[in-house]
Curated annotation (Swiss-Prot):
Signal peptide region: 1-26
Recorded GO MF terms: growth factor activity; growth hormone receptor binding; hormone activity; metal ion binding
Lineage, top ranks: Eukaryota, Metazoa, Chordata, Craniata, Vertebrata
Cystine connections: C78-C189, C206-C214
Organism of origin: Spalax ehrenbergi
Protein's gene: GH1
Family: Belongs to the somatotropin/prolactin family.
Top-level taxonomic group: Eukaryota
Function text: Plays an important role in growth control. Its major role in stimulating body growth is to stimulate the liver and other tissues to secrete IGF1. It stimulates both the differentiation and proliferation of myoblasts. It also stimulates amino acid uptake and protein synthesis in muscle and other tissues.
Binding site for Zn(2+): H45, E198
Keywords: Disulfide bond, Hormone, Metal-binding, Phosphoprotein, Secreted, Signal, Zinc
Protein name per the record: Somatotropin
GO BP term, pick one: response to nutrient levels
InterPro entries: 4_helix_cytokine-like_core, Somatotropin, Somatotropin/Prolactin, Somatotropin_CS
Length: 216
């Protein structure tokens, strides 16, 4: 492995292992730039995990000829499509940081229940088998977003006052066609929602700390 790649991997691993700061006064405050960097790395990691799991599930269970029609039917399936959250980078840039943090938190919290059933669905998955702590990873990102909200608190509407909703749990009966389609749809939403959360966090980080990685 090249020295540059090795250094980059070690830096990413170190940042992913860093704990979030606790309530004010418990520990010295972490710089805001570090809070954003940690949150973005965690969101990227979860989004990649969701995308890999979705692709593996698709290869294993969904015939290639049926994928396009099923994906079209899933277009309005995700509950996140029913909330006024930005759908892309351009729309996200029009929202305040607190709005984006609230939407990110809502998206993450909507998956905390369903993902606890993932390990039962993907017991033999090569992708999921190496990442069976997805619930803990989501909780970690939730804490990071809450830490950012505490730092940026502006006294406006709190995230807890937003309408909260969760997805159905994953179906463990993998012999049922209905269960396969349900899980396929849930994984699609999981991937989309984590992509949104990652996008929101990257937009916030880039406009606060101008850097070359803002082009995404």
């Amino acid at each position: 492995m090249a020295t540059g790649s090795q250094t980059s991997w070690l830096l990413t691993f170190t940042l992913l292992c860093l704990p979030w700061p606790q309530e004010a006064g418990a520990f010295p405050a972490m710089p805001l730039s570090n809070l954003f960097a940690n949150a973005v790395l965690r969101a990227q990691h979860l989004h990649q995990l969701a995308a890999d799991t979705y692709k593996e599930f698709e290869r294993a269970y969904i015939p290639e000829g049926q994928r396009y029609s099923i994906q079209n039917a899933q277009a309005a399936f995700c509950f996140s499509e029913t909330i006024p959250a930005p759908t892309g980078k351009e729309e996200a840039q029009q929202r305040s940081d607190m709005e984006l943090l609230r939407f990110s938190l809502l998206l993450i919290q909507s998956w905390l229940g369903p993902v606890q059933f993932l390990s039962r669905v993907f017991t033999n998955s090569l992708v999921f088998g190496t990442s069976d702590r997805v619930f803990e990873k989501l909780k970690d990102l939730e804490e990071g977003i809450q830490a950012l909200m505490r730092e940026l608190e502006d006294g406006s509407l709190r995230a807890g006052q937003l309408l909260k909703q969760t997805y159905d749990k994953f179906d463990t009966n993998m012999r049922s066609d209905d269960a396969l389609l349900k899980n396929y749809g849930l994984l699609s939403c999981f991937k989309k929602d984590l992509h949104k959360a990652e996008t929101y966090l990257r937009v916030m980080k880039c406009r606060r700390f101008v850097e070359s990685s803002c082009a995404f």
